[in-house]
């Protein structure tokens, strides 16, 4: 359906006294083309409510058991796409964003993985930077394919994934990070005072490591 046909259908239902649900595929607020639909409804003075859902990039994080913003690794998330029939401004190219080394989530790019890898590498990511392809995040048929920037195209091809997938790129997928300040006993917040010094915390960590090592040695005897 075209925009005009969609609006005509909603107008007709409104005139018939029906409640209309415009159930949108994908993420309506990301590459969803809903602004033009809302503007048309406003012109026609038809009231509506925009009901948000869980974004697929959030669903992908859950599927990956990942946090996109890890201390010491990345505190920013870039949501973007490869240029297709809808162009992307040059200043917003994947290559430009890759230079920041932030976590990247790419929509609508599953059919361009060879080109995507080249753009990411040219922008500054190494070939062995952790990456993942999440097919139909949160759906029953969800697939999680872990790979690297250099093996994106091969991984998707071997799993026969050609569309309906998100690409996640960044060191946050590696598992190495710094402990957060939020739950750090040496850190004072609005709700609690620091309970120990960094030196004391270090000694506690060393003692725990020694106890774990001794326990492991005892079990091996």
Each language-model region and where it sits:
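Short, hinge-like loop/turn segments at secondary-structure boundaries
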Residues: 39-41, 66-71, 123, 149-151
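Active-site-proximal loop->helix
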Residues: 62-69, 91
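A contiguous loop/helix-start segment that scaffolds small-molecule binding in enzyme catalytic cores
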Residues: 5, 16-20, 33, 76, ...
